[in-house]
């Protein structure tokens, strides 16, 4: 908790000094073909008007797909579908995600303006190989020694954007993975930019909350 507090404060200091321009937040998430559970689809009204719980049925080990994406206050990357059976080790993460997707999108989106890359502390992200590659190709990034570990409450994708996408793409079960991918892609493109901006702009406030809570997590 002390390390998380220290790193949150350090990032706040860097932001106040203008050292982290145009933050780009990234993350991976697994989606499956089952219907997501939320307050709307997990409850029914009985004849007497009382609300009762209805459990959405789920199969064991449903078909799923891993996706990667990045967001910034002014835009979003392509939604990248990781091929079935592919493990995103350091080599594949660099070649299939950072080199093939992140850099081309960021160069086009920012058009020469400075930007800062964020990723979590997953093994393929924090490896020496990946950190060296990022250092050589992306001028500004939060290294594994700067980002607070185990902090999904600080990543806009984790605390907001993925939930938005799931709530809109997975309200009903998908018959196939192809159908799921189609819905995810459609809803990803339709998320209003103002919602992505709000999530990204919430990052600083959450850092301040971590500091106020002496490293505690933010709801």
Enumerate the language-model features and the residues they cover.
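Conserved, non-catalytic sequence blocks in retroelement Pol enzymes and Pol-derived host proteins
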Residues: 14-18, 56-61, 85-92, 121-124, ...
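Metal-dependent phosphoesterases centered on the DNase I-like endonuclease/exonuclease/phosphatase
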Residues: 129-145
